[in-house]
């Protein structure tokens, strides 16, 4: 086992003579099953840790995004301070339970889908066992984000509603679903879906592309196959910065459309929403409201997310190897 040579079992054949029996191999299906489970587990943990770390900043950003009030770092600080003084420290994480209900499946699906799309595209383009070229690398990230968004979108909408409303309006996640379905119709659960997907495609594509590219360049120049933890955090931070900056206006639009039912506005389309925001608040102040906060929140969250995923993947693989050796 330790020298890398697999010993084949010896037994008797049908004639009674000694013969080498075929070695029982782990099926490809079993390997893929373990790989998928590892990716789902690592992705779920990565999403939960990252989002919890930046939840107060995320909630503050959403509140500014869905209002016409001018954003500034000073006003953001005042909002956080007022929330803390009026409602207590834990109120800064209001809506985080809804966030976890969305983020855990979203991150699990996104990271798992990314691993599967990498294999699929690698097989298609003939890059199996080696790093993908830039276009397939970008495509794998975009497809992963789109898949996760399609499957978990209503949970994102619920999180946005809980973040911008008083506790008395929606008591829990189920209450949000029931009240929206009854008062606004089932279609309301996918309100803002189009700008979300249009924003996710460049965001996820560029984020995964940047992170994978930086890791590849690092391996080529350093001679180390695995970056240190602080290097992973730095690569993830760069990925988050580029990804979120590229899709931010669509993020503002989707938040306005998601929360239209509780803010008194009636946003009907992406173009119409953009025009109304620009007319009322200006192009930069409206469509890029809260971006400076995202330049703090986004890189931190994405850095933690990618790093947690990678390290959890490595840990799970080591545990499985130890378990296999002990057998």
Swiss-Prot record:
It is a multi-pass membrane protein. Gene3D superfamilies: Mitochondrial carrier domain (1.50.40.10). The keyword Metal-binding does not apply. The chain crosses the membrane at residues 36-56, 92-112, 138-158, 192-209, 233-253, 296-316. Solcar repeats lie at residues 34-120, 132-217, 227-315. One of its GO terms (molecular function) is ATP transmembrane transporter activity. Pfam families: Mito_carr. Keywords: Membrane, Mitochondrion, Mitochondrion inner membrane, Repeat, Transmembrane, Transmembrane helix, Transport. The keyword Membrane applies. It catalyses: ADP(out) + CoA(in) = ADP(in) + CoA(out); 3'-dephospho-CoA(in) + ADP(out) = 3'-dephospho-CoA(out) + ADP(in); adenosine 3',5'-bisphosphate(in) + ADP(out) = adenosine 3',5'-bisphosphate(out) + ADP(in); AMP(in) + ADP(out) = AMP(out) + ADP(in). GO terms for biological process: ADP transport; AMP transport; ATP transport; coenzyme A transmembrane transport. Belongs to the mitochondrial carrier (TC 2.A.29) family. This is Mitochondrial coenzyme A transporter SLC25A42. It comes from Xenopus laevis. The lineage of its organism: Eukaryota, Metazoa, Chordata, Craniata, Vertebrata. The gene is slc25a42.
